[in-house]
Amino acid sequence: MVLQKRPDYGFNGYEVPHTPRAARSPRKSAFKKKSENHQISSFDLLAAVAGKLLLEGGNSSSSSNNTSGNNEDQCAVKKEPLNGGDIMVEEETTNSDHDNNNAERSFFVSEILQKSHEMQSFNRSPSPLKEFHFGSSSGITSDSSEKFETQELAYDESKINNGDCYRSESNDKKSMLGGLNFEAKLSRNVVGKDEKHIGSGFRKPIPQNPSTCSDDVDLHGKENDDGENFSACYRTKSFRSTLRIGDRRIRKVWASKYCKVPPKLKDTTVTNSDLDLKSDYYSKKHCLKSLRSERNYPIKKRRYFDGYTASQSEETNKNEGQSGSPRKASAFLSSIACQKQPAAFQSPRDSNNVKLGIKSFRVPELFIEIPETATVGSLKRTVLEAVTSILGGGLRIGVLVHGKKVRDDSKMLLQTGLSLDTLSDTLGFCLEPNPPQSTKPLSPEDSDFARPCNVPHTLTRCLPSPGKHAKPSNSVESDLDSKPSAPNRGKTIYSRALIPVSPLHAQALTVVPPRKTKRSEVAQRRIRRPFSVAEVEALVQAVERLGTGRWRDVKLRAFDNAKHRTYVDLKDKWKTLVHTARISPQQRRGEPVPQELLDRVLTAHAYWSQQQGKHQLLEGPQQLETSLGL
């Protein structure tokens, strides 16, 4: 028996209610699975049973006539062997006075199959099974839970035309609300006869082999005019009930560690009304949505492996999140280049070591005093001796952390806040002269003027202290209370010579004195340096010879060796002397100047003032003639 599918499921008079669709993810799997291991479905089983029963037409027709006019509730069970197995068909009928109420029919078939492949071949073979008949008696369960008696199965003529089901309605009875659904379920346990009460729904048996009951059979029928016979139509249900789907769909969606798998639906009460189906389905649908929305999936934590292993990452976590990525920082003058090697390439012993590379240091400023009578060669030798004394062991290292000097050399790096993640701008170094060997002003007696010029002078190499960062620092502080630090053990020293100089002769060495900043020059100018009596006498003598209008010549003649005296200073001093000579002695301030020098100042000032006036009178007509071209 082959059924043809139509968009309306092959029925003209009755339309199947709208099927609620499940979530997207359960729809990915097929609703039906083909029976495996040669197991037939319930529809094929019913077709085979109907074919066997149609062969005995006499018995079925007689039983149909007997049950048509009988008003009593009857139930009969016919049992026939089929291919070595027993098949028992039971139908329960209940007559109720309420014709307008909905009725539910249950049709139970239990079977024990031994040769299922023979049943499949029997179903697919061409046979006169296209027309088969059922009687008007059916298994109907009412809501009133009335007792019922047995009634024999009867078969009557019915036709199936391309899957269409049709029959006439009686004039004295109203059409039933909803279709009469006969759901055939296969079970290996035979339904007993002694069941007398069935509620509004039937208790659905859970088959032991789900593949044998994958299809449902619906029997839609309406009474004829005589109220005796009706036509039946078998078809495969286009959808499964919610609870049948629950074993596959709902359990599939609930299969997570946050959702508990529901128990097997053995004692679940099922109603066949469309309203109950929709409400039951949508209630579970919303429940599933709420469960899915409340899932708290664990956040996947990304691990960034930046050149270190898991064991080393634990060590870095203990050291307050020390990173293993390489960092480079370089600066000039008083800066360093800090290169942190990746921890993956270091041994566990050296994983917490801080390796630094100091590129340069700033030499402290040198202050040297030398008399005016010293020669250039003596000046060179003096500067060379000062530099040699500093670089030869007169320096010490000062450590600055965040601009503050660390005076205790016995502290650990972690105690001072220095670790692998320390930035290069938090640490600084400075070169300081040792207190006992600090540079002192050199006098002519201290300088060795008698040293021959061919004596070689070499500069020693000073190795900076490794193991720390450096920061530019302009301040030079004395570290008097610092303690000697213990030498580093097992650490490689990365250092360069500060000034690697080969042995040279003093004559070939040109030492440029450190250039003083503009600020220092301004500070030296602001220092008040009064003229002495000798300097005043030298100034008066030079002005008497050269005049008051030649201050540059006066500077070169009288104050050539005095670098701190400029020609502007000489001019200002001359004006001050003229003003001092003109006022009374009681009004004068500063160092007293002899009256004889003041008289000479007035005489020289009056003379050069007259000479300057005469020179202007003589040069005036000559410049006018030259400008006019005469």
Curated annotation (Swiss-Prot):
Phenotype of gene-disrupted mutants: No visible phenotype, probably due to redundancy.
Tissue expr: Expressed ubiquitously.
Domain HTH myb-type residue range list: 523-582
Residue ranges of the region described as Disordered: 1-38, 56-78, 308-327, 463-489
PANTHER family: TELOMERE REPEAT-BINDING PROTEIN 2-RELATED, TELOMERIC REPEAT BINDING PROTEIN
Protein encoded by which gene: TRP5
Compartment(s) where it occurs, according to its Swiss-Prot or TrEMBL record: Nucleus
Pfam families: Ubiquitin_TPR1
One annotated Gene Ontology cellular component of this protein: nucleus
Keyword Endoplasmic reticulum in annotation: no
Keyword DNA-binding: yes
Subunit structure: Homodimer.
Domain Ubiquitin-like: 354-433
Segments of the chain annotated as binding DNA: 551-578
Gene3D superfamilies tied to this protein: 1.10.246.220
Bias-annotated ranges (Polar residues): 309-325
Protein name per Swiss-Prot or TrEMBL: Telomere repeat-binding protein 5
CDD domains (alphabetical): SANT_TRF
Protein's job: Binds specifically to the plant telomeric double-stranded DNA sequences. At least 6 repeats of telomeric sequences are required for binding.
